[in-house]
Amino acid sequence: MIAVITGASGGIGRETAKILVSKGWKVICLQRHDCDVEGTQSIKCDITNQQDIDRAFSMIDKIDLLINNAGFGVSGCVEFTDMREIRSQFELNFFAHIAVTKAALAKLRESKGRVIFISSAASVFSIPFQSFYSATKSAAESVSLALSNELKQFGVSVCSIRLGDVKTGFTAARKKDFAGDDVYGGAIARSVSVMENDEINGMKPEYVAQKIVEITQKKHLPVLATAGGTYKLFCLLQKLLPASLVNKIVGKMYMPEK
């Protein structure tokens, strides 16, 4: 069985690759830097570059599992965040995953394989000053749901796996744009601090990777799944409670007063 993973040089992607290798999978990692997990094959690929994607997939004969994992965060308020930063986040977190998936689909149809989008609880909870990250995850989930129906006739399954806070290098790599923080009374910095503290104290990537692999191996792949019991509860409450109340709770959590 052959798995292709984007963004496996560290964090969740790296741990997922390790588990799959231990289970006898051949794992191909697509990223700009080599994956140091023993037993994996690395193909250097900037997944925001279509030529790189085409070259990478021309080197792959078969795919049973595609895991769209690469991504990064940009924090900042809607009003002052530079449009170039917003577009760059959509390029990697959304458009690149669509391009990679499109390139893999012919081979996935042949194998009746599976497509996984690594999503976030932020897709259903629009977090203040993280709005564009939330938007990229929500957009990818929408495509994932439609794709699931489109590919059903070919025996290809599609799932978005929502994650909560995870302790990885994602936190340090986040681009923080504090432009306008004086106008917003320091709310941007306070909100980002809350987010980073939650991540630093979040789930271990090894645990999350194990949950991801467990979900990918289910006989009947769900179209949506959540890793971690607490976040499953949060997502359930989001369905049951009025949207205005959910949004108010999120605001209280991520916009602490001075």
What does each model-identified segment do?
Residues S9, A17:
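N-terminal Rossmann NAD(P)H-binding glycine-rich loop of SDR-like oxidoreductase domains
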Residues E38-Q51:
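Rossmann-fold cofactor-recognition segment
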Residues N69-V74:
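Conserved NAD(P)H cofactor-binding loop of Rossmann-fold oxidoreductase domains
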Residues C77-V78, D82-R87:
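Substrate-binding pocket helix/loop in short-chain dehydrogenase/reductase
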Residues T101, T136-A139:
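Active-site helix of classical SDR
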Residues S120:
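Residue(s) in the substrate-gating loop at a strand-loop-helix junction
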Residues Q153-P222:
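SDR active-site lid
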